[in-house]
Curated annotation (Swiss-Prot):
The keyword Repressor does not apply. This is DNA-directed RNA polymerase subunit beta. InterPro entries: DNA-dir_RNA_pol_bsu_ext_1_sf, DNA-dir_RNA_pol_su2, DNA-dir_RNAP_su2_dom, DNA-dir_RNAP_su2_hyb_sf, RNA_pol_bsu_bac, RNA_pol_bsu_CS, RNA_pol_Rpb2_2, RNA_pol_Rpb2_2_sf. In plastids the minimal PEP RNA polymerase catalytic core is composed of four subunits: alpha, beta, beta', and beta''. When a (nuclear-encoded) sigma factor is associated with the core the holoenzyme is formed, which can initiate transcription. The lineage of its organism: Eukaryota, Viridiplantae, Streptophyta, Embryophyta, Tracheophyta. It comes from the Eukaryota. It comes from Illicium oligandrum (Star anise). The gene is rpoB. It catalyses: RNA(n) + a ribonucleoside 5'-triphosphate = RNA(n+1) + diphosphate.
Length: 1070
């Protein structure tokens, strides 16, 4: 973080800084730490020794460019080389070689890694910090029971418990409790040592009886007793070295490893001075923990808050990558040992090159990035989505919580989150509170804690000094809130300010303040910081808004927001969507593909992104903003990216809105829009879809790419070139062939029916030796072919198939069924598109663009949209833009209202339009019905709001089925749009049909259109021949399936058709 000494303010750190710094930490420290743990290996006869010389490891720069790796589906990685030596002890001879260990995926400056052509990001995980935690619970008698929980570095738990008789018990992995003396003796302490190292020896001596004293009389007895309780082994086990090794491996090495952070926490909590390199639980730790537990029992000491951030740690990308690297080295060690044993057995002379293979490291990282829950595909819907994804944190994942077991207390916000975790930005649904976003200034410290910056206030310092504090440290300071930024020193000394102290919010004098916040946005995430007037919105609506901004689609013609918060430029810069000048110079050439910059005796060519597809099928494109001959400075923007205008984030459009009902078309959050938004390409966006096909070598021969496809109409093949691949620039419709492919198959005449063979003989048709397996354009994929990539397989590689990828661009205007949203949680679906002349219009004749339901505001309590649309109208008329910091009521009461109304009054005067600000109903205006020309009865709130089109579009969701595939078991239509499935008619839908009395429609839904096989066939035949469709006879397939399942339970269920005739016959027989 940089600091401006003149103004006392600081610039916002880069949003991808946490990810990139974590990866650099892994490269600088983590690699060397794990390589130093790699052991020296000997054969069984100790004639040969293998070791790695880790001081000379090196990473090689990748040979392929990052952009090429995307198109060829490769991993952008670096090769790791280490010096290895093989020593023969007989001749004291050593052979040293540089060996290839494997590939390590690299991270770019935006904090993302490219694996198999897909950008991925590693989410930070929050875990319980290793150490000891004390808590109190009530037993069934209402008596407090104090327990101390020891959490190991990998998450294992052991408990110490003191009962009402002051007896101390130990419980390992929630199993049966045993006396504290048993594990202490098993760890190597005798009874005399225990009594000499505790503060309350009389309590330790009070409860062991003769039988228990015998168990701890010697280490062997204590180990046997502890092993019997820990492993739940019955009988009388015998002490042996193998038993000790098993106990050492399964308990003391796994469940008692505290790690570097756990050792530090244990020393601080129990006032110990054990060296930091002692990362395992010691007898001294157990005895000190028991002493502290006794003090808790008698009212000394404080209990721990497990949800406080000081008791949490961040498992960052550095930790995860280091863990995977250590796992890969363990696998490599096993491979090397096996290879050495095999070479000795076959009397071969191995070399370091023969012993070391790159497979363990490469496959471990591929598995980690592809399968680990914390490794996620980078969300690139728009620039904001990308930077927010890099600052996410999660309680979920290996060693963490699950969405169904996490309690409300864990999900809730905590006072220690202030300035570290955003209280607004979190997921909706089952993961609410378990996945969130770091605050805008937060960073991850060396000990895995989340640190936040503050200004230290001291009389001895002439200027305020900025310090980063962990949650453990700032708990003991009085921290002033951000409102003190607006006060000069003279006013501050007389001021009483709100402050935070020991998880409480107080109001104290300025002289007692130790620290103050550095920025008004300090406690919000990037997404929440982009919402103007957020203080006037309900927190639930602010949460929805911060999530929906990440779903906004980049528009073909974006626009800066009139009302913003000032962070739009920072967000656009951190996203990496813009092209930035790396040094001063002069533009010597520019076009749509590249910009050439000359300066400092060097000329660099900056390639631009042209119609690149994101993983959400949105279009990423850069537009040059500088001309030839222009001089630029370092850091200046050369080209704007998608959803970026003038270096600022631009996710939507400023449009004229009105809050009024209109013939019921905007009820229940529906939105009425003008056709101007369609024909003027106001909300037009481009989407790029990727379709691919592979050619394999089958048992009958290789598949062929060709344009000569038999038995297909020429119309479907019109866009193919001579190679059988669709031509660039072609307009393709649903069902068109994109790539022609033939798969060889066996030609056997006996496989055809007799009449088929007769027809072939009469017509002279040859038996086909190939099957058509072309790539066809699916439903909803119509568009323009903008790129075709044919990825050839490498030489000498028969396993990797050739891949052909076709990229098709779609232009989508806004239409009925699309979802739009503002920045205050005000979302809705387009219900109707009205002609311009029918839309309500203002007193100057301007038609409104969107009509919202006013009933959506009082119940949702998102009043911020009212302030935004009113001041947006003033800004549009005055040609001004506003950047408003949230919580402006810190300066005075009704500050937002006092800002908006004078601007409206000023706009009314300058434009000579008195209707802009009418004192009787400020912010409202009388508007007219476009159909009749009559004014509406009541004045209506009008204004300019910033509205976004979201990724939830009707083109991706609308679906219809006339015929399709059926499930084999139930014979019902498949489910889902991707499988061309049908819509389920369930119980409630049947009830609705019964309520209307539509018997024939109900019968069709449950038989002909569903799972009555014979009725389906009869409908098809009757439709072709003509005539009346017969009624279905017999039971549908799902009922027959139920009968079969009941038969498997030895229950017989018979069914028969009851008609008027059969009913009369049965009646006579009775």
């Amino acid at each position: 973080m940089l600091r401006d000494g003149n103004e006392g303010m600081s610039t916002i750190p880069g949003s991808s800084q946490i990810q990139f710094e974590g990866f650099c930490k892994f490269i600088d420290q983590g690699l060397a730490e794990e390589l130093h743990k790699f052991p020296k290996m000997e054969d069984t006869d100790q004639e040969m020794e293998f070791q790695l010389f880790v001081e000379t490891y090196q990473l090689v720069e990748p040979l392929i460019k990052e952009r090429d790796a995307v198109y060829e589906s490769l991993t952008y990685s670096s090769e790791l080389y280490v010096s290895a030596g093989l020593i023969w002890r007989a001749g004291r001879d050593m052979r040293k070689q540089t060996v290839f260990i494997g590939n390590i995926p690299l991270m770019n400056s935006l904090g993302t890694s490219l694996v198999n052509g897909i950008y991925r990001i590693v989410v930070n995980q929050i875990l319980q910090s290793p150490g000891i935690y004390y808590r109190s619970e009530l037993d069934h008698n209402g008596i407090s029971v104090y327990t101390g929980t020891i959490i190991s570095d990998w998450g294992g738990r052991s408990e110490l418990e003191i009962d009402r008789k002051a007896r101390i018990w130990a419980r390992v992995s929630r199993k049966q409790k045993i006396s504290i003396l048993v594990p202490s003796s098993a760890m190597g302490s005798n009874l005399r040592d225990i009594l000499d190292n505790v503060c309350y020896p009389e309590i330790f001596l009070s409860f062991p009886n003769d039988k228990e004293k015998k168990k701890i009389g010697s280490k062997e007895n204590a180990v046997l007793e502890f092993y019997q309780q820990f492993a739940c082994v019955g009988g009388d086990p015998v002490f042996s070295e193998s038993l000790c090794k098993e106990l050492q491996k399964k308990f003391f090495q796994q469940r008692c490893e505290l790690g570097r952070i756990g050792r530090r926490n244990m020393n601080q909590r129990l006032n110990l001075d054990i060296p930091q390199n002692s990362t395992f639980l010691l007898p001294r730790d157990v005895l000190a923990a028991a002493d502290h537990l006794i003090g808790m029992k008698f009212g000394m000491g404080t209990l721990d808050d497990l949800n406080h951030l000081k008791n949490k740690r961040i498992r960052s990308v550095a930790d995860l990558l280091q863990d995977q690297f250590g796992l890969a080295l363990v696998r490599l060690e096993n491979v090397v040992r096996g290879t050495i044993c095999g070479a000795i057995r076959h009397k071969l002379i191995p070399t370091p090159h023969n012993l070391v293979t790159s497979t363990p490291l490469t496959t471990t990282y591929e598995s980690f990035f592809g399968l680990h829950p914390l490794s996620q595909v980078l969300d690139r819907t728009n620039p904001l989505t990308q930077i927010v994804h890099g600052r996410k944190w999660s309680y979920l994942g290996p060693g963490g919580l699950t969405g169904r077991t996490a309690s409300f207390r864990i999900r809730d916000i905590h006072p220690s989150h202030y300035g570290r975790i955003c209280p607004i930005d979190t997921s909706e649904g089952i993961n609410v509170g378990l996945i969130g976003s770091l605050a805008i200034h937060a960073r991850i410290g060396d000990w895995g804690s989340i640190e936040s910056p503050f200004y230290e206030i001291s009389e001895r310092l002439k200027e305020e000094q900025m310090v980063y504090l962990s949650p453990r440290r700032d708990e003991y300071y009085m921290v002033a809130a951000g409102n003190s930024l607006a006060l000069n020193r003279g006013i501050q000394e007389e001021q009483v300010v709100p402050a935070r102290y020991r998880q409480e919010f107080l109001t104290i004098a300025w002289e007692q303040i130790h620290l103050r916040s550095i920025y008004p946005f300090q406690y919000f995430s990037i997404g929440a910081s982009l919402i103007p007037f957020i203080e006037h919105n309900d927190a639930n609506r602010a949460l929805m808004s911060s999530n929906m901004q990440r779903q906004a689609v980049p528009l073909s013609h974006s626009e800066k927001c009139i009302v913003g918060t000032g962070l739009e430029r920072q967000a656009a810069l951190d996203s990496g969507g813009s092209a930035i000048a790396e040094h001063e110079g002069k533009i010597t050439y520019t076009d749509t593909e590249k910009i050439v910059l000359s300066g400092n005796g060097d000329t660099i060519s900056i390639p631009l992104v042209m119609y690149q597809r994101s993983n959400k099928n949105t279009c990423m494109h850069q537009k040059p903003q500088v001309h030839r001959g222009k001089c630029v400075k370092k850091g200046q923007i050369l080209a704007d990216g998608a959803a970026i205008i003038g270096g600022e984030l631009a996710l939507g459009k400023n449009i004229l809105v009105a809050y009024m009902p209109w013939e019921g078309y905007n009820s229940e959050d529906a939105v009425l829009i003008s056709e101007r938004l369609v024909y003027g390409d106001i909300y037009t966006s481009f989407h790029i879809r990727k379709y691919e096909i592979q050619t394999h070598v089958t048992s009958q021969g290789p598949e062929r790419i060709t344009n000569e496809i038999p038995h297909l109409e020429a119309h479907l093949l019109r866009n193919l070139d001579k190679n059988g691949i669709v031509m660039l620039g072609s307009w393709v419709e649903t069902g068109d062939i994109l790539v022609g492919k033939l798969t060889p198959q066996t030609a056997k005449e006996s496989s055809y029916a007799p009449e088929d063979r007769l027809l072939r003989a009469i017509l002279g048709i040859q038996v086909s030796t190939a099957k058509e397996t072309c790539l066809k354009l699916p439903i909803g994929g119509r568009g323009r072919v903008i790129d075709v990539r044919w990825i050839q397989k490498k030489r000498g590689s028969s396993s990797n198939p050739e891949t052909i990828r076709v990229y098709i661009s779609q232009k989508r205007e806004i239409k009925v069924g699309d979802k739009v949203a503002g920045r205050h949680g005000n979302k809705g679906i387009i219900s109707k598109i009205l002609p311009r002349q029918d839309m309500p219009y203002l007193q100057d004749g301007t038609p409104v663009d969107m009509v919202f339901n006013p009933l959506g505001i009082p119940s949702r309590m998102n009043v911020g949209q009212m302030f935004e649309c009113s001041i947006g109208l003033a800004g549009n008329l005055l040609n001004r833009h506003y950047r408003i910091i949230p919580f402006d009521e810190r300066y005075e009461q009704e500050a937002s209202r006092k800002l908006v109304f004078p601007e409206l009054y000023k706009a009314s005067k300058q434009t000579a339009n008195p209707w802009v600000f009418e004192p009787e109903y400020p912010g409202k205006s009388r508007i007219f019905d476009g159909r009749t020309g009559d004014p509406f009865e009541q004045p209506v709130i009008i204004g300019k709001s910033y509205m976004m089109k979201l990724i939830h579009q009707v083109d991706d969701k609308i679906h219809g089925r006339s015929s399709g595939h059926y499930a084999l078991v139930t014979q019902q239509p498949l489910r889902g749009r991707a499988k061309h499935g049908g819509q389920r008619v369930g119980e409630m839908e049947v009830w609705a049909l019964e309520g209307f009395g539509v018997a024939h429609i109900s019968q069709e839904m449950l038989t002909y259109k569903s799972d009555h096989i014979r009725a389906r066939q009869e409908v098809l035949g009757t439709t072709i021949i003509g005539g009346t469709i017969p009624n279905p006879d017999g039971a549908p397939e799902s009922f027959r399936l139920l009968v079969r399942e009941l038969r498997s339970l030895a229950l017989e269920l018979n069914h028969f058709l009851v008609s008027e005739k059969s009913f009369q016959i049965n009646r006579k027989e009775a």
